[in-house]
Amino acid sequence: MGDKIFHNLSGKTLVATPHVITKGIYHKSLIYMLSHTEEGAIGLIFNRLVNHIDLKSFFKIKNDEITTPVMVPIYLGGPVEHEKGFFLHSSDYNKNLLLDFHNDLAVSSNLEISEDIAFGKGPKNSLFIVGYTAWKPGQLEEELETNLWLVMDCNKEFIFADNPESKWHNALKHLGIDEIHFSSQIGNA
């Protein structure tokens, strides 16, 4: 038995296959891959809109200059550590980045970005995401082999599109797949 080749998926998007993942948090999910190494993987679901929050009250921003609520959508990034929040954003904002990608995207998780967004000085595009998705070593590779996920390149226009409910369908369309014609009987040739 030969060694498996490792393909780093950091900066890519995972698209849940429509007939394999049929319920739960991953049903019709899109996951932006933050990190993928031989030690495991971490990603953020970016199409699970949960609610809207006021940045000023949520982050307890103490500033009287902001007199009206600054409402932003909040997304569920996965089942792990819901108390952790991340801003997945365009790379035009580069203060105290947690991660920076080569596809015009970055991730921040500090209070400064929430204040900058509230004051209109933040990134042009951003999503506030709580929680994340994680895989143990080899787990994601196994899920890919069993066709739980499709992989696609991603760009900021796709991630920051207005309608989160249509992002998954748009991802399939981008891949040239019509959900109606997607077989529930899939496998590797």
Curated annotation (Swiss-Prot):
Instruction: Output the SUPFAM superfamilies linked to this UniProt entry.
Output: VC0467-like
Instruction: Return the GO cellular component terms, semicolon-separated.
Output: cytosol
Q: Which InterPro entries match?
A: AlgH-like (IPR003774)
Listed Gene3D superfamilies: VC0467-like
Q: Which Pfam families match?
A: DUF179 (PF02622)
**Family matches, as NCBIfam families:** PRK00228.1-4
Q: Which family does it belong to?
A: Belongs to the UPF0301 (AlgH) family.
Q: What is this protein called?
A: UPF0301 protein RC0043
